[in-house]
Amino acid sequence: MLWILIEASSSFIPAYVIERFYWEDRGMRIADVVIAEIVFAWVMLIGEIPFGLLSDRWGRKPFILAGFVCEWLSFTVLLEAYSLPAFLLAMALAGIGGAALSGALEAHVYETLRMHRREERFETIWRVISIGGLLTSGLAALVGSYAVRSVDLIWHYHVSWWVLLGTVLLTFFLKEASREQDGETSSLKTLLNGFSFRRVYVRILCLVLLYGATIDFVDEFWQLYLRDQTIPMVHFGFVFVLFQIMQAIGASLSRFRSPVGWAMIYIVCLAGLSVASPLVSIGLLGTLYLCYGWAEPYVTTVIQDVAPTNGRATFTSLISVIERLAVLGTGTLFVFVERVFSLQMTYAALGLVSLILLLLYSVTRTRQN
């Protein structure tokens, strides 16, 4: 129950529904947003493996707590941000928080279940946790959308600041799960050696990157995309709720276990966004989130199942680092296409990236260890 409360609390962020407009209102252009995302990705890239190694040695709770504290500090900076350096500082703090949290909460849940010999229920429980977070973020979007009619955009950031402070306080009540240690904690070199000899990791990577290298840009720019499609900002809260509901529905569809099928739908939707009309584009975006809602718990479960017991957080961080590198590459492509063509055409480029990764996944999937 506490896991669900923490996930729900950290997801109740009304600021997200007006995030891009808040940045734009304070002078940030699309290129500035991408630069900030790249800074976030680099900080995550640099910090994830060290945090993972320390988490495997010192436990999960300190890093879950540190992660939420940094995210709270990020919003503290955003409340007073009026220049690119200030926004970059906020993103750097968010990156540190993300690096500290990376794999820690999933590992805490998995290890707690394993301690009670119930690890086979991880995917089910993680899907419930995900659905709780999605529904709460949908509620936050409704609140944020309604409030934008009568209050300044900064109100959303004040509410988010207090909610994150509450999340920090909730985290103090987590109990560290006992971990089975097979000798000493795995070093990074040991994990890298094991990583290189297991082809299943390549398949996992392809699936992780298929979504991870593209969904960030869908998240960051759907507001501007729909605005360019002449959809009024007042409807964005309801649109966001639709996306969250679709993602929650996807998270509940655990019986439909077809990674290739879901990925193909995802790619078709990305490509369709480059030519879609306003109403169709909302449907395509909703379907994207449906696919991602199914994929995220599935991939998380697979990673936890194959991760070494005494290096779980480090292994998860290693996967995440590779994902961040892919985001950097995709971000470069995104900026190029947006400047040369349009924001709408960037979705075709994202679809191409996902298609290449799906082909790699299909090839490696046929080669059994």
Language-model segments: what does each one mean?
Residues K175-C206:
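Juxtamembrane intracellular "pre-TM" segments in multi-pass secondary transporters
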Residues V69-S83, F87, F172, I265-P278:
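C-terminal ends and interior cores of transmembrane alpha-helices
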Residues P259-V299:
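C-terminal transmembrane helical hairpin of 12-TM major facilitator-type secondary transporters
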Residues M1-I46, R199-V241:
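Helix-loop boundary and gating motifs at the non-cytosolic
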Residues A92-G133:
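Cytoplasmic helix-loop-helix junction between adjacent transmembrane helices
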Residues I30-A31, H116-I129, M233, T309-I319:
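Loop-to-transmembrane helix entry/capping segments in MFS-fold secondary transporters
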Residues L45-Y82:
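Conserved MFS/SLC helix-loop-helix module at the cytosolic interface between two early adjacent transmembrane helices
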Residues G133, W155-F173, Y347-V363:
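Symmetry-related core transmembrane helices of the 12-TM Major Facilitator Superfamily/SLC fold
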